[in-house]
């Protein structure tokens, strides 16, 4: 919650735009700050005015907007900000913050929980330009990504993201998720190099020790790994059958199979061909003697009571032994 000294410090380091927290819900206005709505409104407008006087562009963070009185507080406040922007000639951004993740994307949902209603309302009842609107979501109810996409679709020009979705409580909107949402909506990547997503995930994991859950889309260890033999058989015939897209080209992550008791000869064959591809060797048919030797060894492990998956190191060793025996 900024004051004049904060703005002076921000300006001194060369920053031209800064965020100003302007909590909107009665939970914050009454219970946290102990103010009336009018007192809160006057206080916020004074802070934004100080920000503009300091030569900075304000970005107003409408905290807890999905629990706020939309027509009783949010719209009147946004109207005053747009008047201030017009009078000063300084653009004022509004960040709609779904602080507790209560927002929903469903058409016809009631305000203040309706994401589309919030974005539509700020544009049509307060005259906030699309380029001055952004969405800030949380994932408490697993709606982080879909709510952010809904905000885009209804006119917010930007959505706030974090790398790997790391953030308060259950996390924020993952940057990598919105990259692919953008591509699916626009039909192109607009020059983005999506392989960097894998590099970012590797960097964060190695440098911070953060363990990425293996099932995490796009960045988890197992996001494009299949364990079922019937799936592996499909992958042998055509990657598109069981791979979400060309993960090798877009993420530098070729599809993988995990060999276990249900992988079947197709799963073993797929693993061997991935190994051979890395070594610059030609692929082999799943009915080849090489695949049969390794498959028989795998089955022997489970016939003897093994319950864990076969590791890549074990499969590498058995594949090399089988190739030497040919």
What do the PLM-derived regions correspond to, one by one?
Residues 6, 39-43, 47, 61, ...:
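General structural feature for long, well-ordered alpha-helical segments within catalytic domains
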Residues 34-35, 134-135, 165, 255-256:
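Short, contiguous strand/loop micro-motifs
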Residues 1:
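Glycan-recognition patch characteristic of GH18 chitinases/ENGases
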Residues 100-244:
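Catalytic alpha/beta core domains of metabolic enzymes, predominantly
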Residues 4-129, 149, 153-154:
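Alpha/beta enzyme core
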Residues 14, 18, 22, 26, ...:
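Structural signal for hydrophobic packing residues in well-ordered secondary-structure cores
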Residues 17-19, 59-61, 93-95, 134-136, ...:
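Structured core elements
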Residues 187-326:
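A mid-to-C-terminal "edge-of-domain" accessory segment
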């Amino acid at each position: 919650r900024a004051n004049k000294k904060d703005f002076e410090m921000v300006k001194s380091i060369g920053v031209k735009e800064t965020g100003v927290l302007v909590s909107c819900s009665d939970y914050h206005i009454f219970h946290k700050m102990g103010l009336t709505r009018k007192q809160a409104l006057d206080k916020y407008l004074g802070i934004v005015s100080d920000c503009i006087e300091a030569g900075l562009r304000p970005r107003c963070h409408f905290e807890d907007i999905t629990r706020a009185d939309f027509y009783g507080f949010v719209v009147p406040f946004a109207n005053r900000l747009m008047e201030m922007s017009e009078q000063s000639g300084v653009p004022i951004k509004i960040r709609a913050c779904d602080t507790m993740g209560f927002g929903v994307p469903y058409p016809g949902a009631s305000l203040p929980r309706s994401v589309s209603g919030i974005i539509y309302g700020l544009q049509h009842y307060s005259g906030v330009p699309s380029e001055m609107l952004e969405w800030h979501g949380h994932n408490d109810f697993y709606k982080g990504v879909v709510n952010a996409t809904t905000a885009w679709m209804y006119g917010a020009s930007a959505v706030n993201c974090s790398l790997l979705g790391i953030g308060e409580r259950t996390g924020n909107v993952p940057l990598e998720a919105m990259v692919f949402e953008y591509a699916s909506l626009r039909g192109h990547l607009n020059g983005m190099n999506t392989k960097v997503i894998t590099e970012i995930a590797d960097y964060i994991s190695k440098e911070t020790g953060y363990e990425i859950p293996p099932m995490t889309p796009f960045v988890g260890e197992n996001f494009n790994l299949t364990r079922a033999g019937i799936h592996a058989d499909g992958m042998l015939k055509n990657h598109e059958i069981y791979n979400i897209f060309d993960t090798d080209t877009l993420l530098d992550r070729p599809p993988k199979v995990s060999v276990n008791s249900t992988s079947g000869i197709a799963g073993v064959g797929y693993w061997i061909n991935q190994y051979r591809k890395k070594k610059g060797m030609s692929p082999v048919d799943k009915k080849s003697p090489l695949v049969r030797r390794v498959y028989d060894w795998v089955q022997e492990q489970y016939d003897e009571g093994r319950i864990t998956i076969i590791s890549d190191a074990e499969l590498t060793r058995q594949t090399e032994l089988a190739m030497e025996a040919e």
